[in-house]
Amino acid sequence: LGWLAVPVLFFAVIGTVNGVNFTDGLDGLASSVTLIVAVFFTVVSIGMKSGIEPITGAVVGGLMGFLLFNVYPAKVFMGDTGSLALGGFVAGTAYVMQMPLFILIVGLIYLIEVLSVIIQVTYFKATHGKRIFKMAPIHHHFELCGWSETRVVAVFSVITAVMCMVALLAL
C-alpha cells in the first residue's frame, strides 16, 4: 500500500471499531457476527502458523460463553466497552495477520451498518428531512419492516459465515 498504508490503517481501524459498535444494537448481533469472524481468524491463523491462535481462540471461547447470556432475550449486555474492544480485536488481528483488506469481506456486516448510517444522515441533510431507511443502523430498519430480532441476527450471521467462506477461498 506504500504511503497509503497509514491512512488506510486509520480508516480501517476507526471504521471497524465503529462498525462493531453500530452492530451492537440487538441481542446477540455483534457477538454472533464477531464470533464467526473470530473463528475465521482462528482457522486462518492455524493455517498460516502465525502464532496468534491462543488470542483468537480465547476470543472465540469468550464469545461462545458470552453468547449464552446475550442471545434473545439477553440477560447480559456488552455495552460500548465490549463492542469497541471487539472492533479493535477484528481490526488488530487483520493487521497482525497482514490481511487488512479482508476486513471488507469478513466484516461486510460492519461495513453495511456504518454505510447505512452515513447514507441516512447524508440523505436526511441533503433532502431536508427525508429518509432512505426507516431507521439506521440498518438492523433497526429490518426490525421496523417486520423482521424479528432473532431473524435479523440469524440472517446477518449467515451472511457473515458466507463471506468468511468467500474469504477462505480467496486465500
Listing of model-derived features with the role each one plays in the protein:
Residues 2-171:
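Alpha-helical transmembrane segments
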